[in-house]
Amino acid sequence: MADGEDIQPLVCDNGTGMVKAGFAGDDAPRAVFPSIVGRPRHTGVMVGMGQKDAYVGDEAQSKRGILTLKYPIEHGIVSNWDDMEKIWHHTFYNELRVAPEEHPVLLTEAPLNPKANREKMTQIMFETFNVPAMYVAIQAVLSLYASGRTTGIVLDSGDGVSHTVPIYEGYALPHAILRLDLAGRDLTDSLMKILTERGYMFTTTAEREIVRDIKEKLAYVALDYEQELETAKSSSSVEKNYELPDGQVITIGAERFRCPEVLFQPSLIGMEAPGIHETTYNSIMKCDVDIRKDLYGNIVLSGGSTMFPGIADRMSKEITALAPSSMKIKVVAPPERKYSVWIGGSILASLSTFQQMWISKSEYDESGPSIVHRKCF
């Protein structure tokens, strides 16, 4: 395999919250780190520490006390290209330890990513990193491939944004894609707020990470929200303890399901938007009547914010209530869905049929960044 390793494609899934990167053909990403770039708040505090002008990922996270943290990706879309370049540089050279000029690179993008963004991504890959070939794939489509399907509707909910993406025979249907600016980060904020009401103060960026951990470890989706609230009032069956880094132990009860309930009832945090179940239904209704049956039968969950226990059953219950009564509804929640975008990319980049799909350096040199619209769709 010494030979193959050289040309093994790299797969990099850039999320709002986490970067997932690794080698095509692997079954999991080698590197998973926060999509953050930290810059020192005060220059020269750490004299003689060989202070860098910027820290990326876990290092930024661990030094967060002295840094200002920035997320270059907002709502799934790159908004700060200088920082994004730093993240890619860190991915190739520090995490994967590869020379990008020796490997084809598969990148992922949010559904409905603006055209200028795809071009900028393409340009940076070829001009800054000198990659021999690259491709840009839509995240939700990769998740569907990872589940072994080519037709279905994907609810992809990450840290910064959620999308419902109907896909037919491998192609996303852009007119029916819906975006919901409600995702993991909002759930963390909402839990911070609920905990503040109870007298626990979480305010800084560092403390937000603690709340995120509480959310990931303890939150779940109730099948029947009102009934669960009653249960929580009358018994302590939903209560769990969590030990903070300083040793203080807090007890959380109804907060455990109040937090992800926001996905189904955005009005709980004052958002005027339909919940994920309604958004999924609306997406299906924007599709041709002939393919709806295939979509209802293949609702695939993807992304970190679909990892809550109970979410698939609740989703199934809510969509059954909206859909025609005779319709067969199936909600699929693959256990590896936190990384299914990356896994789908790994599968796609290793297919022999995919090898002619790459945009090569020579094609880029000939046509410029707009080549991406002709070759990646």
Curated annotation (Swiss-Prot):
Disulfide-bonded cysteines: none
Record field: catalytic activity: ATP + H2O = ADP + phosphate + H(+)
SMART domains named among the record's database cross-references: ACTIN (SM00268)
One BP annotation, GO: cell division
Induction: Differentially regulated in response to exogenous hormone treatment. In particular, auxin is a strong inducer.
Residues spanning the signal sequence: none
Tissues in which the protein is found: Constitutively expressed at high levels in young expanding vegetative tissues. Also strongly expressed in the hypocotyl and seed coat. Little or no expression is detected in mature pollen sacs, ovules, embryos or seeds.
Sample GO molecular function, one term: ATP binding
Intracellular or extracellular location(s): Cytoplasm, Cytoskeleton
GO cellular component, one term: plasmodesma
Phenotype seen when the gene is deleted: Impaired trafficking and endocytic recycling of ABCG36/PEN3 between the trans-Golgi network and the plasma membrane in root epidermal and cap cells.
Residues recorded as bearing N-acetylalanine in the entry: A2
Remarks, miscellaneous: There are 8 actin genes in A.thaliana.
Function: Actins are highly conserved proteins that are involved in various types of cell motility and are ubiquitously expressed in all eukaryotic cells. Essential component of cell cytoskeleton; plays an important role in cytoplasmic streaming, cell shape determination, cell division, organelle movement and extension growth. This is considered as one of the vegetative actins which is involved in the regulation of hormone-induced plant cell proliferation and callus formation.
Quaternary structure and partners: Polymerization of globular actin (G-actin) leads to a structural filament (F-actin) in the form of a two-stranded helix. The binding of profilin to monomeric G-actin cause the sequestration of actin into profilactin complexes, and prevents the polymerization.
Protein name: Actin-7
Gene: ACT7
